[in-house]
Structures are given as structure tokens and as C-alpha cells.
Swiss-Prot record:
Presence of keyword ATP-binding: yes
Lineage: Bacteria, Bacillati, Actinomycetota, Actinomycetes, Frankiales
Cofactor annotation comment: Binds 1 zinc ion per subunit.
Record GO cellular component, one term: cytosol
Motif ('KMSKS' region): 236-240
Alphabetized UniProt keyword annotations: Aminoacyl-tRNA synthetase, ATP-binding, Cytoplasm, Ligase, Metal-binding, Nucleotide-binding, Protein biosynthesis, Zinc
Subcellular location: Cytoplasm
Originating organism: Frankia alni (strain DSM 45986 / CECT 9034 / ACN14a)
Function text: Catalyzes the attachment of glutamate to tRNA(Glu) in a two-step reaction: glutamate is first activated by ATP to form Glu-AMP and then transferred to the acceptor end of tRNA(Glu).
Protein name (database record): Glutamate--tRNA ligase
Catalysed reaction equations from the record: tRNA(Glu) + L-glutamate + ATP = L-glutamyl-tRNA(Glu) + AMP + diphosphate
MF-aspect GO terms: ATP binding; glutamate-tRNA ligase activity; tRNA binding; zinc ion binding
Quaternary structure and interacting proteins, as annotated: Monomer.
Gene: gltX
Motif, 'HIGH' region: chain positions: 12-22
Amino acid sequence: MGSGRVRVRFAPSPTGIFHVGGARSALFNWLVALRAGGDFVLRVEDTDASRNRPEWTDGIISALDWLGISPGRYEGPVLQSSRADRHRAAAVRLREAGLAYFCDCTREALAERTGNAQHGYDGFCRDRGLEPGPGRALRFRTPDDGVTTVHDLIRGTPEFPNDTIEDFVIARADGSAVFLLANVVDDLEMGITHVIRGEEHLSNTPKQQLLWAALGAAEPPVWAHVPVIVNEKRQKLSKRRDKVALESYRDEGYLPGAMKNYLMLLGWAPSGDDEIVPWETIESTFDLADVKPSPAFFDEKKLRAFNGEYIRALSVEEFIAAVEPWLAPPAAPWAADAFDAGTFAAVAGLAQSRVSVLAEIVPMVDFLFLPAAPVDDAAWAKAMKGPAAQLLADVHDVFGKIEWDAETLKATLAELGERHGLKLAKAQAPVRVAVTGRTVGLPLFESLEVFGREATRRRIAAARDRLAAG
């Protein structure tokens, strides 16, 4: 394309979940437009009526908004189905120019002629002069010789001999355009200058480049095919096998900043040794020419670690605001009127340093707002053995008489544990399980200080009595 205004498009299909791979492609497109002062177009390719659902389109818009690509900052959404007449008109033009022809070959007939139904089309109907009719699709007449060279910012200049490109279908028997043609018509008429998409589309590119030329374009767009994303087994991410829905990460409590930063690393890297970098730095340095063509490994553990770092970078006030959706029903297991904002604020800083995703806040603080400790049977069995019963009895008694602060609580439990031959780490376990229901969580003594003397002693008494009852 020439040196005019840069225009990119993100063109998802509303046929299911919004994939993390789609999110990465959207971000790459967004940054190219942003850096060039150009335009980002959201085009929803909804021509497959049997699979499209309106809620999937809404999900795309919502996901982009979460990533910072907000309505009002881009053109669209443009529904591809609204342009069906333009696609049909292009198909007619190609046929009238002798660049396309009707074909009534079935898969069975092709298999009979070639011995393999999967074999590329053999051109049987090229010169039969068929007119439109039932069961007759329209095929593009590819050149017999020459080479189609694709200039790709990431993959160089792959070449495709034209005699290996079959005469491909561009319109169905009912006149509706297939993806290959509709995609090109829309890109051409919308003035798209850069097509940035996943490498799985690379095999379509020579066909689409031929269509660009056939429809009168002086030159094709700038192509950039970003690397495939793979799982830990180096298999392409699959929605049937892998956790790929952006919504599931959002609902689990991943921050958009962390997700954006991590997705950008799937094929690209900022300069220097730091991978966690301000978004402003990514905006100012991202360049498609720096994207590597090799497969990019989606490491959920690394993403989780990234998210933890982003959480810890928040102020306590920002953290409290971020976890708010998880602090009330239905996300929270406690009654709405049981939650106390002051109590939570007192432990928020302790929790912030320990969670990797926001949803982890619930099991970390639920003991503060539930009427009884949410005791896990495995935790109970692990902690409530040996001298636990007598220790809890002593703790219940002594905790009624001491100053109620974390330092005193720690010193007191250390002393009581020593009487029973237990180091502090071992002495803490039955007390923690009695009060919180779990073997791990917030710092124990700071938690007890916030929870309060009477509430703590009630939980310890309940555990003591349960042990006594056998």
C-alpha cells in the first residue's frame, strides 16, 4: 500500500468465546494504528448465520473494552452481513470479466476423477460455460503460471507458484460470498492498508492477493501474520483442550494491564531485560518488524505471576476497589449484610501481598464474615492431632486475659506451644484451622487482632469441643 493514512481492522467472527489469540491480534492492530495516528476498524464477520449469536458480538465488544479498546475510539462495529450486496456485486463483476466461472462439481465427482476427495480442484468446469443454477458455485480462475509473492512484515516474502493454487470458490450457489471474497471486498472498500492476523490465515493470503488485483487494487495491503500460540506441549491452543477464553481470565480476577502486557510478549518483546513494562512504553516501542515468526508459548503460570506483580503495584485503595466485585454475593459465600468494609480494609494490605488473582481474596478472608469457620476436612485432619485439644483449651483460656495485639498474641502462643513441646509453626496450625478453617492464609496474628478477642475465642472453643466429642 502507499503512504496514505494507516487503516487496520480487527475482524473476529461471533461464533463462540473470545480467544486470547484474538485478543493479542486486536492489541497488535490497535498499537499499529495508534503509533501511526491511523484508524482501527472493528468488523464483525457474521456471515455464518448458522453459528452466529448476538451475545457473542456483545462479548467481543466487552472484551475489547476491558483491554482498553473502547467504543468511540474506533470505527464500528461493522457487521459484514450488512455488506452482502457489495459482496454479490463483486462476484458478478469477476464473472463478467471472465475471472470466475460456475462449477457444479460435487466432492464425490472430484474424488472419482482424482481418486481423493481432499485433492485440490482439478479445473474440470473451467471451460464448460455453465450458467447460474442450483448446485453451481462460483470459482475464481487462478493464473496458470507465474508466482504470487506475499510481502509479509513478519515472514519475509513467501512465494506461491500459481499452478499450485486451485481455482477456489468465491460464492455459493445462492450467490452469497464466501469468506475469501467477502474479506477482500470489505478490506478494499474500507481502505484497509494493513492486514494483521494469525499465521493460520497465511495459506489464504495468495488467494486473497489475487482477488485484490482482480478487483482493481493497485497493490495489496501490508501483510503481517503473527505467530501461532501454543500450549506447554507445543500444540496450538484449542478451545476444546486449553483455557483460552479471555472472559474466564477476566472473571478469575486477572487485571487488564497484566493481561495486555503478557499478550504482547507472545511474539514480541520490549528492549532490555524487563518483561513487565508500563503500557506507555509498549505503545511507544511496539513495531511489527520486531515480531518473531516462531510459535509463542502461552504460559499460564507466568501470566499468573505477572498478574500478582500488577496487583502488588496497586495502592491499597486501588486494590480494595479492584476486588469489590468478589466481596458480595454471588461471588462471596457470606450474606451481604455480614460484610464489614472496615474489617476488610484492615486486612486488605495483608491480602494484597498474597493473591495472584483477585478471586483468591474470597478464601483468604471468608472466615472474617461467615458465622462459622469454613473448615476443610483435610486441613482439620492435618492440624488437629497430638496435643491440639489441650493446646486449644489453654489458648482459649489465656486469650481471654492478655492484651489483644498481634505481637502479644504471637508471644503467648509461642509460650503455650512450648509447654506442649511444639515450636510456634506447629502450635499455630490448630489455632489457624480453628479460626480460619484452613492451613494457609493471611498472617495469623494480624488476622486474629482484626477478628477480635470474642470471635476468636468462640471459634477456638468450637474446635476444642469438637475434638472433645471425638
